[in-house]
Structure formats: structure tokens, C-alpha cells
């Protein structure tokens, strides 16, 4: 549930100072679509995203929180996991007579769940940003050095990540299609479950989360806008599945969602 409005807002900063917060509520259907291996998946996730532009660039962060209830079959209720990303971009070049700009990007990722902390990482590198004249079509591409930090029994190592972020608003602002796609190199569930050790546990991980929204209240405004829609989490080597029940590495986890852009 992340980065999905960053692309549009990052382009706006080229015009004027700008800030926005949105809150999302997702009902996760992954447990139903993957009963063989995700029977313990959380049913509810909330996301808070904040973007603020200034003269030098922009700051962005999001926080995901996962929840379980009595009906989920878990003895633990309430918040059972949290994850956040915070990033800073500095604009250093703009292509004359075009809507293309370049930024220097720095980012931190970290979080935890009931089994312990996730492996933290730091990312740095360049980013390319593009938008059309009315900002209804946007695209960002990042090519980043990613350093996985040592901790919790996992070795630190150098890696990379490529990220694409897009946004398209159409049908007289009624519909928005947005999302991101990440590809990186790190420890994978499949290699760990096979009993591999050290660097042999690592492999390519792919994650994309396209979202489709119907903007039902204040659709022509960036603020006080209410949207209803869905997110599809599509991944390979990302989900830590129940190895006793499944051997596959590709997963589809859809949600039903509400979003309030403040």
C-alpha cells in the first residue's frame, strides 16, 4: 500500500510548494485467494501517506499497519505488524522545454511483525520524473543502490533496486489507475526453505501493487477527496508462505479499499 500517490505529487513540486496526506483502509482477500499457504494472513491493513514539496525537492513517507481480529483465528488482536518507508528527493536538473526532471533519491525502509523485525535497508540513487501538461499522467523511474543492513541473524550485503511508479487519472477525474513495481535482490523465502545458507539464500524479488480508484467525492480536488477501489499485490519470491502447505513463489493478494485524501 505504498508510493502510489508519490509520482503525481513529486511532479507538482516543480510548480509550487505542495503537501498532502491520505489515509487508506484495505480489507485483504489474500487469505481467501491463497488458503493453501496464507491461512494466517492479516485481514485489515491501514496506510497513512504524507508528501511535502519544497524549493529543494520533496519528502515522502508512508506507514502500513496490519490488524487481526477474533474472527481471523489468531489469539492476538489489534495491531500485529508495522512497516514504513521514508524518502527524500533533491531536484538537480530539469530538461528544458519538457516535463522531465531528475532527482537524487535517498530512502530508509524498516518494520516488524509478531515474529520480529524485518531486515532494514537504505537506498540511494537517481530518479527520472515525467508528467503531462495537466499532471493527469505521471511516471517516475528510480535506479537505486540498496544496502541490506545486518541484524536479526541475517547478514548485511550490497544490493540494488529498480522502481517504477505511475499514475493516470481519466474519465473526467472519476477514475485513477496508479501503482508501483519493484525489483530487488535479497534473501528469498524459497531459498531459505530449501535450507540454503549465506549468500545462496538470496535471489531476485518482484513486487507490484497496482490500484484502481473511483473518486466518488470531490473528484476534481486534491483535498477532501473520497475514493473507493481495489489494490492487487502481485509478487514473486516476496511472500513468506506456509512451506508445509505450498511450494509456489508467485502470489496474488487483492484488497477492497477506501481512501481519503485530506
Outline where the language-model segments fall.
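Short loop/turn motifs that connect adjacent beta-strands in outer-membrane beta-barrel proteins
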Residues: 20, 51, 56-60, 91-103, ...
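Transmembrane beta-strands of outer-membrane beta-barrel pores
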Residues: 27-31, 65-69, 106-112, 143-149, ...
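Outer-membrane beta-barrel "beta-signal"
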Residues: 250-262
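Short glycine/proline- and aromatic-enriched beta-strand/turn motifs that initiate or cap beta-hairpins
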Residues: 19-68
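Membrane-embedded beta-strands of outer-membrane beta-barrel proteins
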Residues: 48, 86, 124-126, 162-166, ...
Amino acid at each position: 500500500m505504498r508510493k502510489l500517490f508519490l509520482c503525481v505529487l513529486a511532479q507538482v513540486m516543480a510548480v509550487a510548494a505542495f503537501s498532502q496526506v491520505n489515509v487508506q483502509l484495505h480489507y485483504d482477500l489474500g487469505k481467501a485467494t491463497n488458503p493453501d499457504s496464507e491461512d494466517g494472513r492479516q485481514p485489515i491493513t491501514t496506510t497513512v501517506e504524507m508528501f511535502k514539496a519544497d524549493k529543494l525537492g520533496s519528502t515522502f513517507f508512508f506507514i502500513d499497519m496490519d490488524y487481526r481480529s477474533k474472527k481471523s483465528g489468531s489469539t492476538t488482536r489489534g495491531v500485529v505488524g508495522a512497516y514504513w518507508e521514508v524518502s527524500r528527493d533533491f531536484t538537480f536538473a530539469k530538461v528544458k522545454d519538457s516535463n522531465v526532471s531528475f532527482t537524487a533519491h535517498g530512502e530508509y525502509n524498516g518494520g516488524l511483525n509478531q515474529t520480529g523485525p524485518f531486515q532494514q535497508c537504505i537506498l540511494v540513487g537517481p530518479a527520472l520524473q515525467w508528467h503531462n501538461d495537466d499532471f493527469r499522467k505521471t511516471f517516475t523511474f528510480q535506479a537505486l543502490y540498496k544496502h541490506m543492513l545486518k541484524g536479526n541473524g541475517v547478514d548485511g550485503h550490497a544490493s540494488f533496486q529498480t522502481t517504477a511508479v505511475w499514475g493516470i487519472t481519466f474519465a473526467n477525474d472519476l477514475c485513477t489507475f496508479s501503482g508501483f513495481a519493484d525489483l530487488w535482490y535479497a534473501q528469498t523465502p524459497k531459498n531459505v526453505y530449501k535450507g540454503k545458507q549465506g549468500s545462496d539464500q538470496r535471489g531476485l524479488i518482484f513486487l507490484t501493487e497496482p490500484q484502481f480508484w473511483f473518486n466518488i467525492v470531490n473528484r476534481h480536488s486534491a483535498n477532501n477527496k473520497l475514493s473507493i477501489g481495489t489494490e492487487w499485490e502481485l509478487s514473486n519470491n516476496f511472500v513468506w508462505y506456509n512451506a508445509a502447505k505450498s511450494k509456489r513463489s508467485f502470489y496474488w493478494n487483492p484488497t477492497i479499499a477506501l481512501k481519503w485524501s485530506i
